C-alpha cells in the first residue's frame, strides 16, 4: 500500500496540468436534467468545457450499474449497461483535451458500503471496468476514464476514504497518463457524507454544490469556509470549483451578473479553479441574447474576473506588518480564551437541548448539523473592572494593564440552520431562522431559541465581580446595533428541532443561563435572562421563491429530475424503460 506521502505526491503530479488555471468550466453530463440531452461528443466540441463528469455510477457495489438516461440502453448478459457510443465519445473528448471523470453516487441511486473491507475491494472493480484494468464486461469498452468523482449524497460515509486510497494505488501502476480524484460535497461544511474523504485523502478537485442549501451564492455564500478547509487539506493544492445550476428552475440558480459578483470576491484565492455546472442539457438550453449557451457565458465571467497579482514589494510590506500585529494580539489574549473552554461547552450542550426541543410542532425535523449567523439584530458592549483597577487601564489596550480588565459583550444574533422538512412523504432541505445569544470574552455562552421573534429581544446581563470575598454587581443592558456575519458551530447531527405551525402562536419563554470564571483573585458570574415571544414561522423566502423567477424552484440534488410536472421526468432518473409504463 502506498504511504500518505506517496499518495500526496501522486495527487500533486496529477493536478499540476490544471493547477494554474482559475477559469475552468466543469460540466456534469448524463442525467438529461432539462431534456433533449445529446451524445457526449457534441458537448466536448465546445472549447470552453474543460472537465466532463459522467453522471452516474449510481448502483454499487452489488448490484453494479450506471445510468445515463437517454444515452445508453444496451446491456451485457449480467444486466450491466453496455455503452459503446459513450466509450467512443470519451476517447473523442480526451483527444480534444478534456478531462473525463466518472462520477459515483448522485441524488438517486442505491449505493454504499457496509464495511471498510468491501469498499477497499471495490477499487479493483472500478479499475478493471472503467480504468486501465481488464474485465469481460466494460461499459465503455476499451475507453479509460481519467479518474473518479465522489458525489455521495446518501447511504453513509463508510469506506470512501479507503476506496479513494486504494484507487490512488491503482493509478500509480499506470504511468501513461495522469489520473484524478474529486468530490462533490454540498456547501454546508463539513459535508455529512464526504467530510471524512475530504479530510483524509489528498484529492485534486472539489466541485462544491453551492445550491439547494442556505449557503448558495444568493444566500449565505460560504466559499471562505471551504477555502480555509483547503488550506489544511491533505492536498494543499486542492482546487475548488463553485458549483451552480445551469437552468433557472433549480433552486439556487444565479444569472451571470450575480455569478460575476461572487467570483469577483474570490477570484484571487489560491484554491479557486472555476465553476462546475449541473447539467449539460440545461446549459445548452440556457442561451443569452447573443445565442451563447451557459457554458460560454460562465467562461466569459471567469475570463473577465481574472485575478491581477499585486506587486511583490507591496505584498512583502503588508505581510510583515500583519504578522507583527497578530503575534502581539495572540500573546495578550490567549490565556483568557483557554481558561473558558471547559465551562462554555457544558453550558452550550445543556441549554441547546433544553430550548430547541421545547416549542410545539406539527412535524419533526432533523437538523443537518450546520448553522451560520446572518446580520445581527443587536449587540451591546460593556466593560467590568476588577476592584483596584481604573478605567484608563482597561481601555488603553497596552502592556500588562489590559489583562486586568474583564470585557463583556452581549450579542443577539439571527442564525439559519438547515433542517429536512417532510410532509406527505416529500422532503426538502429547508433553512429555518433561529436566534442566538452570545456572551463573550472570558466566558462564551451560546443559547439557541426557535423560532426567531418578530420584535427586538431584550437581554439583561448581570455581572458580579468578586475580589477578596467582596462582590460588586455591575448590570449591563443591550441595545440594537448591526453586526457583521460570522460562523458558529451548529447543533450535533441528529438533533431534532421542532417549530410551530404557521398561523399558531405561543406565549412567553424565559431562558436563564449562568456561567462563572475565575481570573487571579477575581471571580465573574454572568447571568443571561432572555425574554422571547414566540411567533409563527413564515416559509423562508429562499424556499418559497427563486428570486425573479416566477416558477416554483425544483429542489433536486444532482441526479434528480430538474423539470417538475412532466412525464419526461421518469427518463431523467430511472434507468429501466419499463418504469415509464406506470405513467
UniProtKB/Swiss-Prot annotation:
The name this protein carries in UniProt is Chitinase 2
State the signal peptide span: 1-19
Q: Which Gene3D superfamilies match?
A: Glycosidases
Q: Which UniProt keywords apply?
A: Carbohydrate metabolism, Cell wall, Chitin degradation, Chitin-binding, Glycoprotein, Glycosidase, GPI-anchor, Hydrolase, Lipoprotein, Membrane, Polysaccharide degradation, Secreted, Signal
> Where are lipid groups covalently attached, annotated GPI-anchor amidated glycine?
560
Q: Which residues form the GH18 domain?
A: 23-305
Task: State the organism of origin.
Answer: Candida albicans (strain SC5314 / ATCC MYA-2876)
What's a Gene Ontology MF term here? chitinase activity
Could you describe the post-translational modifications of this protein? Answer: The GPI-anchor is attached to the protein in the endoplasmic reticulum and serves to target the protein to the cell surface. There, the glucosamine-inositol phospholipid moiety is cleaved off and the GPI-modified mannoprotein is covalently attached via its lipidless GPI glycan remnant to the 1,6-beta-glucan of the outer cell wall layer. Proteolytic cleavage by SAP9 and SAP10 leads to the cell wall release of CHT2 and increased chitinase activity, suggesting a direct influence of SAP9 and SAP10 on CHT2 function.
Its record classes its membrane topology as:
Lipid-anchor; GPI-anchor
Q: Give the sugar-modified residues.
A: 370, 546, 549
Q: What class of enzyme is it?
A: hydrolase
- Please give the Pfam families that the UniProt record associates with this protein: Flocculin_t3, Glyco_hydro_18
In the induction comment, the record states: Expression is positively regulated by BCR1 and FKH2. Transcription is greater during growth of the yeast form as compared to the mycelial form, and down-regulated by micafungin treatment.
UniProt keyword Glycoprotein present: yes
Q: What does the UniProt entry report for the null mutant?
A: Leads to the clumping or clusterings of cells from early exponential phase, and to increased hyphal growth on solid media.
Residues annotated as catalytic = 153
| An example Gene Ontology CC term for this record | extracellular region
Mark which residues the record calls propeptide. Answer: 561-583
Q: Which reaction does it catalyse?
A: Random endo-hydrolysis of N-acetyl-beta-D-glucosaminide (1->4)-beta-linkages in chitin and chitodextrins
Q: Which family does it belong to?
A: Belongs to the glycosyl hydrolase 18 family. Chitinase class III subfamily.
A GO biological-process term:
cellular response to starvation
* Subcellular compartments: Secreted, Cell wall; Membrane
Q: Supply the EC number(s).
A: 3.2.1.14
Q: Which domain of life is it from?
A: Eukaryota
Amino acid at each position: 500500500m502506498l504511504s500518505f506521502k506517496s499518495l500526496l505526491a501522486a495527487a500533486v503530479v496529477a493536478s499540476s496540468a490544471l493547477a494554474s488555471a482559475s477559469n475552468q468550466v466543469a460540466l456534469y453530463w448524463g442525467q438529461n436534467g432539462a431534456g433533449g440531452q445529446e451524445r457526449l461528443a457534441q458537448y466536448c466540441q465546445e472549447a470552453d468545457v474543460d472537465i466532463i463528469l459522467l453522471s452516474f455510477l449510481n448502483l454499487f457495489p452489488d448490484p453494479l450499474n450506471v445510468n445515463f438516461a437517454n444515452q445508453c440502453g444496451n446491456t451485457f448478459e449480467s444486466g450491466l449497461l453496455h455503452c459503446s457510443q459513450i466509450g467512443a465519445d470519451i476517447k473523442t473528448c480526451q483527444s480534444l483535451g478534456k478531462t473525463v471523470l466518472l462520477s459515483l453516487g448522485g441524488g438517486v441511486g442505491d449505493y454504499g458500503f457496509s464495511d471498510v473491507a468491501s469498499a477497499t475491494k471495490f477499487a479493483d472493480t472500478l479499475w478493471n471496468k472503467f480504468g486501465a484494468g481488464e474485465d469481460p464486461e466494460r461499459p465503455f469498452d476499451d475507453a479509460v476514464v481519467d479518474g473518479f468523482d465522489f458525489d455521495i449524497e446518501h447511504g453513509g460515509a463508510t469506506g470512501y476514504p479507503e476506496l479513494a486510497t486504494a484507487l490512488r494505488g491503482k493509478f500509480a501502476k499506470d504511468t501513461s497518463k495522469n489520473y484524478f480524484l474529486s468530490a462533490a460535497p454540498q456547501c454546508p461544511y463539513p459535508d455529512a457524507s464526504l467530510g471524512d474523504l475530504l479530510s483524509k485523502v489528498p484529492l485534486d478537485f472539489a466541485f462544491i454544490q453551492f445550491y439547494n442549501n442556505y449557503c448558495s451564492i444568493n444566500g449565505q455564500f460560504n466559499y471562505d469556509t471551504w477555502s480555509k478547509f483547503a488550506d489544511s487539506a491533505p492536498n494543499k493544492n486542492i482546487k475548488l470549483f463553485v458549483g451552480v445550476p445551469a437552468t433557472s428552475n433549480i433552486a439556487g440558480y444565479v444569472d451571470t451578473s450575480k455569478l460575476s459578483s461572487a467570483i469577483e470576491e474570490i477570484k484571487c484565492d489560491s484554491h479557486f479553479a472555476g465553476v462546475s455546472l449541473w447539467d449539460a442539457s440545461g446549459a445548452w438550453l440556457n442561451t443569452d441574447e447573443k445565442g451563447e449557451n451557459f457554458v460560454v457565458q460562465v467562461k466569459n465571467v471567469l475570463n473577465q474576473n481574472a485575478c491581477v497579482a499585486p506587486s511583490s514589494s507591496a505584498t512583502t510590506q503588508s505581510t510583515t506588518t500583519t504578522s507583527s500585529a497578530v503575534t502581539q494580539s495572540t500573546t495578550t489574549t490567549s490565556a483568557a480564551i483557554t481558561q473558558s473552554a471547559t465551562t462554555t461547552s457544558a453550558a452550550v450542550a445543556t441549554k441547546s437541548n433544553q430550548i430547541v426541543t421545547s416549542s410545539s410542532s406539527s412535524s419533526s425535523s432533523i437538523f443537518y448539523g450546520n448553522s451560520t449567523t446572518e446580520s445581527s439584530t443587536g449587540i451591546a458592549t460593556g466593560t467590568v473592572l476588577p476592584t483596584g483597577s481604573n478605567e484608563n487601564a482597561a481601555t488603553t489596550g497596552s502592556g500588562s494593564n489590559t489583562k486586568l480588565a474583564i470585557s463583556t459583550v452581549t450579542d443577539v444574533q439571527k442564525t439559519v440552520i438547515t433542517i429536512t422538512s417532510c410532509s406527505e412523504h416529500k422532503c426538502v432541505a429547508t433553512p429555518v431562522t433561529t436566534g442566538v445569544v452570545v456572551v463573550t470574552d472570558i466566558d462564551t455562552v451560546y443559547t439557541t431559541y426557535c423560532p426567531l421573534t418578530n420584535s427586538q429581544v431584550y437581554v439583561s446581563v448581570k455581572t458580579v465581580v468578586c475580589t477578596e470575598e467582596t462582590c460588586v454587581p455591575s448590570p449591563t443592558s443591550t441595545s440594537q446595533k448591526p453586526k457583521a456575519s460570522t460562523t458558529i458551530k451548529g447543533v450535533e447531527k441528529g438533533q431534532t428541532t421542532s417549530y410551530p405551525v404557521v398561523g399558531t402562536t405561543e406565549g412567553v419563554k424565559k431562558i436563564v443561563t449562568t456561567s462563572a470564571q475565575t481570573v487571579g483573585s477575581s471571580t465573574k458570574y454572568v447571568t443571561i435572562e432572555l425574554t422571547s415571544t414566540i411567533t409563527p414561522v413564515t416559509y423562508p423566502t429562499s424556499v418559497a421563491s427563486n428570486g425573479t423567477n416566477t416558477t416554483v424552484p425544483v429542489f433536486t440534488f444532482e441526479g434528480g429530475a430538474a423539470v417538475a410536472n412532466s412525464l419526461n421526468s421518469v427518463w431523467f432518473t430511472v434507468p429501466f424503460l419499463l418504469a415509464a409504463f406506470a405513467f
